[in-house]
Every structure is written in C-alpha cells, then in structure tokens.
Amino acid sequence: MPKMKTHTGTGKRFRVTGTGKIMRRRANRAHLLEHKTSRRTRRLYDEVPLSSADNRRIKRLLAR
C-alpha cells in the first residue's frame, strides 16, 4: 500500500511536538489589531494543544 500524503494545508497550520501532541495557533492575531488590547494580543502569541475532539481527524490529515 502506498504512503499516505500529508494534506498540505493542514501541514502548514499544525505542528507535532516530540511527544506527539498536535499544536495549533490561536485565532484573532492576523489583522485588525488596533482595537485589541496589548494584553489580549500578547496572550494570543503562544501555540496551544489541539482539543482531543479534533485530534483524530487532524492526525489523519497529517498522515500520522
């Protein structure tokens, strides 16, 4: 059976850690930042782990 290909859009949006957790970026930090507080934008910097509900689907798209 041939290898599964990674879904390229998913590959660009998610990162797999060494322990196998899937990390994602937070929304609301791309544009229209003028009216958002510094505190709010600062809290959106970090990547967060993907929710367990989405894990299986994203793993399949990442061919893992």
From Swiss-Prot:
The keyword Aminoacyl-tRNA synthetase does not apply. Gene3D superfamilies: 4.10.410.60. GO terms for biological process: translation. Keywords: Ribonucleoprotein, Ribosomal protein. SUPFAM superfamilies: L35p-like. It comes from the Bacteria. GO terms for cellular component: cytosolic large ribosomal subunit. One of its GO terms (molecular function) is structural constituent of ribosome. InterPro entries: Ribosomal_bL35 (IPR001706), Ribosomal_bL35-like (IPR021137), Ribosomal_bL35_sf (IPR037229). The keyword Cell cycle does not apply. Belongs to the bacterial ribosomal protein bL35 family. This is Large ribosomal subunit protein bL35.
